[in-house]
UniProtKB/Swiss-Prot annotation:
It is a single-pass membrane protein. NCBIfam families: PRK07352.1. It comes from Cyanophora paradoxa. GO terms for biological process: proton motive force-driven ATP synthesis. The keyword Flavoprotein does not apply. SUPFAM superfamilies: BAR/IMD domain-like. F-type ATPases have 2 components, F(1) - the catalytic core - and F(0) - the membrane proton channel. F(1) has five subunits: alpha(3), beta(3), gamma(1), delta(1), epsilon(1). F(0) has four main subunits: a(1), b(1), b'(1) and c(10-14). The alpha and beta chains form an alternating ring which encloses part of the gamma chain. F(1) is attached to F(0) by a central stalk formed by the gamma and epsilon chains, while a peripheral stalk is formed by the delta, b and b' chains. This is ATP synthase subunit b, cyanelle. F(1)F(0) ATP synthase produces ATP from ADP in the presence of a proton or sodium gradient. F-type ATPases consist of two structural domains, F(1) containing the extramembraneous catalytic core and F(0) containing the membrane proton channel, linked together by a central stalk and a peripheral stalk. During catalysis, ATP synthesis in the catalytic domain of F(1) is coupled via a rotary mechanism of the central stalk subunits to proton translocation. It is found in: Plastid, Cyanelle thylakoid membrane. Belongs to the ATPase B chain family. One of its GO terms (cellular component) is proton-transporting ATP synthase complex. CDD domains: ATP-synt_Fo_b (cd06503).
């Protein structure tokens, strides 16, 4: 409704004339026709009576804008604090990650060294065990061979003695020994 009244007022103040396909606007200076007095009364009432209303409205709007600005500033400051805290936590996390990585590398290197040292010990132990096993086997084989050589030598001696001690030689040997014993008495 305000829009309709304002267009009526505007149209009453301005007169449009169209001549030769061109629009020309001009100001209507007839006071009675334009309701200038009515307009002045309305403007006076708006300014005089509406001033406290518009002042209060503008003051409330100003307070709302200031409150929103303060809230925005507070939010901005809180966001800056949170960003600062997040950066601090990020730096701490990066430092912790770096320390964990360094510790992991140290542990891996230690395990590697320990593993290599243990591997060398195991290889040395296996070599020693193998050498001891070989030595034991050699002694066992040497002992077996000595026994076999001794057994073979005894068999040869027995065989040779059997050849030398035939019953006739055996009787002669016994007789000689008996004679030697008699002589000694």
């Amino acid at each position: 409704m305000n829009l309709i009244n304002s267009t009526k007022i505007f149209s009453s103040l301005m007169i449009a004339s169209v001549e030769n396909n061109t629009a020309i606007f001009s100001l209507n200076t007839d006071i009675l026709e334009t309701n200038l007095i009515n307009l002045l009364v309305i403007f006076f009432l708006l300014i005089y009576q509406g001033r406290p209303f518009f002042t209060a409205l503008l003051e409330e709007r100003r307070k709302t804008v200031l409150d929103k600005i303060k809230k925005s500033e507070n939010s901005y400051n809180e966001a800056l604090e949170k960003l600062k805290e997040a950066k601090s936590k990020l730096a701490q996390a990066e430092l912790a990650a770096k320390q964990i990585y360094e510790e992991a590398e140290a542990v891996a290197e230690s395990i590697k060294k320990t593993g290599l040292a243990q591997l060398e010990k195991d290889i040395k132990r296996i070599e020693e065990t193998t050498q001891a096993s070989i030595n034991t086997q050699q002694l066992s084989v040497i002992t077996y061979l000595r026994q076999q050589v001794a057994l073979l030598a005894l068999r040869r001696v027995v065989s040779q003695l059997k050849n030398y001690l035939k019953p006739e030689l055996h009787s002669q040997f016994i007789d000689r020994k008996i004679l030697q014993l008699r002589k000694q008495k």
